[in-house]
């Protein structure tokens, strides 16, 4: 019987250690504690409608156009080359006779009688 009472004693001590609140006021309602911080209030976010602004345009600035001064270049001349002038040799070409078109050949050239 000593082992039975010892096991019951160990059971109760372990129950007190393992259960955090133990056997304290199990059946009572917990005491009211006011909240430490205020609860958040859900307000709809107030967004202003977008305001249409025209694009910003800077006024035109009157600046004179930049003109480059004209550049005077001397005319390009090839350097003189010291070569004797070459004369073209005359080429003799016999005058070309064109054959008659849409005509009968002359009688002396005609071999058909």
Curated annotation (Swiss-Prot):
UniProt name for this protein: Early nodulin-12B
Region (Disordered): 29-113
Family: Belongs to the plant proline-rich protein superfamily. ENOD12 family.
Native species: Medicago sativa
Signal peptide interval: 1-24
Principal place of residence: secreted
Residue stretches of biased makeup (Pro residues): 32-42
UniProt KW keywords: Cell wall, Nodulation, Repeat, Secreted, Signal
Assigned GO CC terms: extracellular region
Span list, region 15 X 5 AA approximate tandem repeats of P-P-[QVHRTA]-[NHKE]-[KEDT]: 34-109
InterPro entries for the chain: Proline-rich_CW_protein (IPR051308)
Compartment(s): Secreted, Cell wall
GO-annotated biological processes: nodulation
Tissue specificity: Expressed only in young nodules.
Residue stretches of biased makeup (Basic and acidic residues): 45-60, 67-113
PANTHER family to which the protein is assigned, alphabetical: PROLINE-RICH EXTENSIN-LIKE PROTEIN EPR1 (PTHR34629), REPETITIVE PROLINE-RICH CELL WALL PROTEIN 3 (PTHR34629:SF4)
Function in brief: Involved in the infection process during the plant-rhizobium interaction.
